[in-house]
């Protein structure tokens, strides 16, 4: 076993020993269906604490020939399938955690070289007799290995987008990284040596102009989770079972932590659900995820309508969002829709795929956004609060003219033109 090549199953073994483990191994039924096909390159993006690393470790444990995982998986859901053993521990797996590599590389500028050389060194140890001394890249080595042995690889990249997010202004490093990924996955040779590729991170694959930098990948995102919706977070049935086991109020859990609708399925934040099961306290666990510090600069961006849109969603409205212009990075914002699209990928907003509307999914996230805007002392939110107080006082005093005028004012200011005549937007104003 190596650090990159066939790392084994110990990481996933620790997950299985957790107090709460929700079985998501049926994802393997999907990957087993597409492995070795032209749909075998997958990018599954989701917010922090939605189980990305656990999934990556599960895939490595299942496919890696560097370990024996039969006993580990035979008692799980995937173990019931007739095809369970077909691909079990049959492949050379390359598993890369870019976040860890970035830290261990010493200088962030060395990250890509560190990853390439680390993989290449381990491939030479395992297959040195078929790799010429002139080969300088990991993907070049895999090409030679495949040509000589016929072996194919499962490549798993966890936190694939960390260099895109954390080094947003380092164009030289980003270009080097994108070129490395293209060498690994794009072209005729990669189709020969790749059995399966699985990238996971917060952001979808970076766009170059209007096209994905890796347009041969099937993307599953918070905008469109497709067939992987059930594996992105906890489902309604899974949460009901946990509430029963830990004697928690299901309706309260639903109010606090539900709200994402992915391909028609209710999806909950796993981190929050596990925390409330273990602690019994209904509170916001989101600020513990590490993305809160990135929220305030985003919502403070000077785009027309951004603050009004956020205040409108805090009050319960949905907002129309055009998601197609977002470049899948942290710097190329052209309008409020790009910012709102990023907030969807970060998990602060949910997205209704049918009507292309964004909304705040639950009480936990509403509190987070309220804290953020109040911390920044937005004039708009203070004005909104004053209007709400005036409306309340007018209602108590039975001043029907003022009540009508205030409702009309708030409805005009915090409801989009598209939604103005929608009864849900008016009910949100009244709420």
Language model: regions and residue ranges:
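Phosphate-binding site recognition
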Residues: 1-428
């Amino acid at each position: 076993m190596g650090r990159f090549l066939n790392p084994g199953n110990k990481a996933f073994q620790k997950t299985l020993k957790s107090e709460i483990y929700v079985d998501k191994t049926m994802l393997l039924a999907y990957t087993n269906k597409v492995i070795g096909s032209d749909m075998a390159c997958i990018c599954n993006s989701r917010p922090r604490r939605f189980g990305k690393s656990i999934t990556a470790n599960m895939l490595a444990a299942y496919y890696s020939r560097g370990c024996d995982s039969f006993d580990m998986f035979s008692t799980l859901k995937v173990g019931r399938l007739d095809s369970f053993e077909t691909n079990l521990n049959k492949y050379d797996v390359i598993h890369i955690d870019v976040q860890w590599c970035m830290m261990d590389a010493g200088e962030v500028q060395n990250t890509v070289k560190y990853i390439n050389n680390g993989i290449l060194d381990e491939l030479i140890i395992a297959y040195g007799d078929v790799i010429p001394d002139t080969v300088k890249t990991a993907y070049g080595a895999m090409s030679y290995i495949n040509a000589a042995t016929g072996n194919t690889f499962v490549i798993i990249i966890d936190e694939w987008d960390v260099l895109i997010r954390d080094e947003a202004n380092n164009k030289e490093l980003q270009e080097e990284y994108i070129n490395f990924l293209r060498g690994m996955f794009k072209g005729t040779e990669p189709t020969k040596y790749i059995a399966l590729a699985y990238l996971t991170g917060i952001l979808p694959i970076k766009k170059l102009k209007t096209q994905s930098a890796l347009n041969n990948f099937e993307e599953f995102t918070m905008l469109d989770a497709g067939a992987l919706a059930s594996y992105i977070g906890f489902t309604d049935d899974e949460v009901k079972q946990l509430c029963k086991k830990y004697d928690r109020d299901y309706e309260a859990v639903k109010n606090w932590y539900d709200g994402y609708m992915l391909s028609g399925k209710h999806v909950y934040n796993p981190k929050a659900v596990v925390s409330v099961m273990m602690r019994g306290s209904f509170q916001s666990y989101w600020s513990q995820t590490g993305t809160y510090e990135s929220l305030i600069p985003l919502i403070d961006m000077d785009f027309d309508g951004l603050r009004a849109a956020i205040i409108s969603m805090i009050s319960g409205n949905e907002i129309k969002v055009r998601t197609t212009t977002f470049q899948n990075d942290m710097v190329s914002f052209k309008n409020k829709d790009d910012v709102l699209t990023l907030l969807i990928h970060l998990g602060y907003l949910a997205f209704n795929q049918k009507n292309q509307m964004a909304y705040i999914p639950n009480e936990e996230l509403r509190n987070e956004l309220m804290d953020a805007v109040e911390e920044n002392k937005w004039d708009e939110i203070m004005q909104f609060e004053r209007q709400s107080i005036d409306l309340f006082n007018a209602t108590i005093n039975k001043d029907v003219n003022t009540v009508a005028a205030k409702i009309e004012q708030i409805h005009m200011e915090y409801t989009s033109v598209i939604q103005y005549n929608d009864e849900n937007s008016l009910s949100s104003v009244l709420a």
